Amino acid sequence: MKLAASLNRLSPKRLFRTKSKASVSRSEPSSFSSNASSSSSDGSYGNLKQGPTATPISVLPQNSGDFYTELVQAFKLIDRDDDGVVSRGDLAALISRLSHEPPSQEEVSLMLREVDGGDGGCISLEDLASRVAGTSGEGSVETEELREVFEIFDVDRNGKISAEELHRVFGVIGDERCTLEECMRMIATVDGNGDGFVCFDDFCRMMVPAMNDHHH
């Protein structure tokens, strides 16, 4: 998995926010609330603990606030012990929660080197920001890469993402406030055929503009 490309896409609220003003044709329960997007914005630069090798927030470009706020939030999801760096243990724990099998030591090492660029054995926010900035102009997203992100959500590997699977990912990454009904609403915003699921084609149509937003 291309770690730098995937970290910033793990937030379900980022992925499943609608890009269209078209209304959803099927009716939705009146109990749906609009606070799904607001609860994803409680992270901020100032809340990132400055550990011994943590990154000064000043390294982040000031003209890309929304994107880098989301990058900081993605970093904090993985830095579970809040020491300002993503260690081998942090990364292995995240992958174990999101996948069916725990990663091998070799896989974790490859992911760390991909972002860190050396043998430090950990990833700072600066490493991640530099890596994402360096890959932002590499062109269109590869289908293989999209498939890897899709499979994080498609837990039962049936080729589509359900509201229950989306809700599970929220719990895994530490956002337990999002309800199943809110997940159903998010699914509805991108569900092309109205079957209550997001297939891979729906996912691709949603992801490409979402991942290119910060380029403009």
From Swiss-Prot:
Expression is induced as follows:
During darkness conditions.
Give one Pfam family, short name only. Answer: EF-hand_7
The entry marks the following residues as binding Ca(2+) 3, namely: D191, N193, D195, D202
Put simply, this protein is called Probable calcium-binding protein CML35
Give TM regions: none
Query: One GO MF term, please?
Result: calcium ion binding
Cysteines joined through disulfide linkages? none
InterPro entries per record: EF-hand-dom_pair, EF_Hand_1_Ca_BS, EF_hand_dom, EF_hand_pair_protein_CML-like
Summarize where Ca(2+) 2 binds, as residue positions: D154, D156, N158, K160, E165
The function of this protein is: Potential calcium sensor.
Q: Where is this region: Disordered?
A: 18-58
Highest taxon, organism lineage:
Eukaryota
Q: Where is the composition biased (Low complexity)?
A: 23-44
Residue ranges of domain EF-hand in the record: 66-101, 103-138, 141-176, 178-213
Q: Which GO terms describe its cellular component?
A: cytosol
The positions annotated for binding Ca(2+) 1 are: D79, D81, D83, D90
Question: Could you tell me the keywords of this UniProt record?
Answer: Calcium, Metal-binding, Repeat
